[in-house]
Amino acid sequence: MARSRTWTAVIAVVCAFTLTAGLAACSSSDDDSSGGGGNTTGVTDTSIKIGVAVSDLDGLRAAGMALAPALTTQNLSKRLTSYFDEWNAAGGINGRQVEGVVMTWDPVKPATAQKVCDDATINTPVFAMINSNGMGAKYIECIAQAGVPIFFGDVAPQSAHDTGWLTTISPSAEVNAKSGIDAAIKSGQIPKGAAVGILSGNGPEHVAAVAAAKTSLEANGNKITVAQINTLQGDPGIQNTESAAAVNTFKAANVTNIAIALQFTASNGFWDNAGGNNWQFTFLDVASSMCTPFGGKSLKPSAVGGICFTVFGDSVTPDGKLKPESAFEKECRAKFDALSVNDFGGAPSYPGVPSGETRTLPDGTKVSSDAPPNECTITNVMKRALEKAGKNLSRESFMKALRGLGEVDIANGSNGIGSQKEGKTYLATLTHPVKLTAAPTGTAKNATGTYNGCPVDVQCWVPTGTTWYDIAS
């Protein structure tokens, strides 16, 4: 007997709004008609709909955040949709054209990302989804729980990974938090028995990360004080007032070390008041842009010297030289330069230049926004999986093909190499320590071609050594 439209609507609403919904219910559909069965939502004989979630940058500008002129919603979108255009021009994927469906949220109001989940799963359902960075992990999990394959360039909690539909570049917040704290303890940065503060948000990724970090700290005999900032309410002013108050909380607890599990957009108040306390900072790569070049340049000078263990790579070497790019990274840069040729007045992309910016270096060289690695990595993996899934495309056949890819390329991360196999929901295989390094505007280029070790005269993360470590799951 055919399923009623009313019952179908009820299932869709439950899947989209309930993060504990069972995947068996969420992955069924009236559109199940592929040759081998499975969910074919967003797929026709001639097309595949892929959702592209990007932040509406008008909200950030309205809130007073200074953004580079070329950093626009449209330009963010085409960093992904341009790959679809390229595939389509070459004949599509197994005879189908890929249609990008752009969905936006207001980054000043994180809860507006609920509409992205609603649209992707109910209103204008797509076959699969991409968010290269920035969207709240709560809403990434909402989409994954509804049985939609989703790629995410930032860090999500393990519960989102456990849906089986999420693929990230980095491991879960819990894995990153534990590995970061364990490394800090092993290196002596966090001494046994020391008083340790944790600066965190209250999103699911933050809460999960703090729980994992506390497990390792408690085993090390550390006294722990947590300052939790309300990141879910979305007002940067309130968040930064709360993070500023955390300074006094940590002073009262006589902490010597602080683990940072809070993104820069909510922690500026803390950094404005953190200087002069002789605290050691360990950054946990558990939230948006924590240990990326954009996150590094956005932190206040008082954060300089902090250490982060991250899968994300760098444009420089520990001995202060520009890092040679892999063949894949060169390909990513060439595609971005071709895409953005009219956005930066002819200035080529250059390692370390903040997203959307055009910059004149102290030696007079004019350069522009670095090539974005996440978009290149994700679309490359997605294309390979779509091709491998064949003509009888369903969400299930796509995920099986994706998990069976084996070795994959990663731009500016995991020492260039990642992997996919059954049960592995993230791409990276390696992690390494990086140190936040000062390079204020006007810093002179040194004899090795960098600016106090940074690729340009912008504060950056510099690797502390050449060794990459296997990720401990």
Stretches found by the model and what they are:
Residues 274-376, 464-468:
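Extracellular/periplasmic periplasmic-binding protein-like sensory domains
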Residues 166-277:
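Extracellular/periplasmic Venus flytrap/periplasmic-binding protein
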Residues 31, 36-38, 89-164, 168-171, ...:
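Beta-alpha junction/loop-to-helix N-cap segments that form part of ligand/metal-binding clefts
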Residues 21-25:
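C-terminal motif of bacterial Sec signal peptides marking the signal peptidase cleavage site
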Residues 52, 120-134, 151-154, 195-200, ...:
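Periplasmic-binding protein-like
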Residues 35-119:
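N-terminal extracellular/periplasmic Venus flytrap/periplasmic-binding protein-like
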Residues 41, 406-473:
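Solvent-exposed, acidic/polar segments of extracytosolic/periplasmic ligand-binding ectodomains
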Residues 27-29:
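Bacterial signal peptide processing site
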